[in-house]
Curated annotation (Swiss-Prot):
The active site is at H13 (tele-phosphohistidine intermediate), E91 (proton donor/acceptor). GO terms for molecular function: phosphoglycerate mutase activity. This is 2,3-bisphosphoglycerate-dependent phosphoglycerate mutase. The lineage of its organism: Bacteria, Bacillati, Actinomycetota, Actinomycetes, Kitasatosporales. Belongs to the phosphoglycerate mutase family. BPG-dependent PGAM subfamily. It is an enzyme of class 5 (isomerase). CDD domains: HP_PGM_like. It comes from Streptomyces avermitilis (strain ATCC 31267 / DSM 46492 / JCM 5070 / NBRC 14893 / NCIMB 12804 / NRRL 8165 / MA-4680).
Length: 253
């Protein structure tokens, strides 16, 4: 291994149509809204201004992350780099909550149950029925996933377990070549990765929020441990304000 630190950039997709409507999204494939597109472009500008230019990008199979990567890379003039996509970087599957309004869910089930489903490490929501309009059971992009691995609901622990094989088999090999790696993904798949990188406990991960569209830069040592624990946001003031807004999701009317 090289002695120089490895460079990893995490980027949560820009605001989506359902983020703006305060709906649980999960595996439902919604697009970015206009604000989200601008966030993605700004994310690329931040990368370029910082001189932190990715050599390869990894993203999910969901269009909001794919589109964010495209817009950010175009803005940073890195549209030509290799792109790898995996369902293992998808957002957490929210089960029967997918498509539901967060504020209405909070009012219906109460804050304790709402927060248990939304933020506990190992308590998933009820599973999504196959016949639901928000089911991905017939989606061709997931046809190659063995049925036993295709989720109908997930907690964050499930996301960690399905994401980590891709970290070791897909992302780490690119880091080992000395490439600067961009991972454009989702709030919970990135929380799962940050939990692993920073060694965050099952209890403390509940308090971690990742804002949309603001690159989070990590420098990793040769054991892939952060030299800058918690990472460094390229726009820390905007990140702090956005993190506070994420905390308040569910309270919006």
């Amino acid at each position: 291994m090289a002695d120089a630190p490895y460079k990893l950039i995490l980027l949560r997709h820009g605001e989506s149509e359902w983020n703006a409507k305060n709906l649980f999204t999960g595996w439902v494939d919604v697009n970015l809204n206009e604000k989200g597109e601008k966030e993605a472009v700004r994310g690329g500008e931040l990368l370029k201004d910082a001189g932190l230019l990715p050599d390869v990008v990894h993203t999910s199979l969901q269009k909001r992350a794919i589109r964010t990567a495209q817009l950010a890379l175009e803005s940073a003039d890195r549209h030509w780099i290799p792109v790898h996509r995996s369902w293992r970087l998808n957002e957490r599957h929210y089960g029967a909550l997918q498509g539901k309004d967060k504020a209405q869910t909070l009012a219906e089930f109460g804050e304790e149950q709402f927060m248990l489903w939304r933020r506990s490490y190992d308590t998933p929501p009820p599973p999504l029925a196959d016949g639901s309009e928000f089911s991905q059971s017939d989606d061709p992009r997931y046809a190659s996933i063995p049925p036993e691995l295709r989720p109908k609901t997930e907690c964050l622990k499930d996301v960690v377990n399905r994401m980590l094989p891709y970290w070791y088999d897909g992302i780490v090999p690119d880091l080992l070549t000395g490439r600067t790696v961009l991972v454009a993904a989702h709030g919970n798949s990135l929380r799962a990765l940050v939990k692993h990188l920073d060694g965050i406990s099952d209890e403390d991960i509940a308090g971690l929020n990742i804002p949309t569209g603001i690159p989070l830069s990590y420098e990793l040592d040769t054991d892939f441990k952060p030299l800058n624990p918690g990472g460094t946001y390229l726009d820390p003031d905007a990140a702090a304000a956005a993190i506070e807004a994420v905390k308040n999701q569910g309270k919006k009317k």
